[in-house]
Amino acid sequence: MLFYDFEVFKYDWLVVVIDMTEKKQHIIINNNEELDSLYQAKKNDIWVGFNSNHYDQYILKGILCGFDPKRINDFIIVKGNPGWKFSSLLRKIPLNNYDVMLNLDKGLKWFEGSMGNNIKETGVPFDIDRKLTEAEIAETVKYCIHDVEQTIEVFLQRKEEFNGRLELVKLACKGKALDLSLISKTKPQLTAIVLDAHRQGDRGDEFDIDFPN
């Protein structure tokens, strides 16, 4: 299981990945090849993030497809579009993504405060119109590591939520080999699969589900 978080700027991007199985920390900065190598080695694992269903997974997939991550970032954050609409190519990158964020959550920083932890904010503005300095990259890496560590803490507090999702995945597989890609789906989606629900046209909309009568 890997925990990950991306930070994206106009001319720089970085990701911190903490591999809980191998107890390793990966820090990748502006290196598409290194990211691809890590993905190829770990694509069958579960990747865990905070709000990763709506953001980080699409940054990861986009970089692997050769897109500029800032374009994807702005498509999602600035224009308010769902990440899956950016390009159909993103669907060709399988990822067992699990998002610890729930619908009513107020954000990772809110969790940090509610858990009694220090809230860390980066001093580097995300709209900076130049390459980051070495000092700014170091500060952003430190901030990103902190966010991943907080994501791990949220996951541990919500372990039962994950276990419940995993049980639904097992039921959805109906005795066949475990398909971990299903871990990305919401509980209603998994319940629909278990109940043999069907979609009315596959538009790629994760909330468009038709339950059987």
What are these regions (language model features)?
Residues 34-37, 59, 107-110, 139, ...:
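Exposed alpha-helical structural elements
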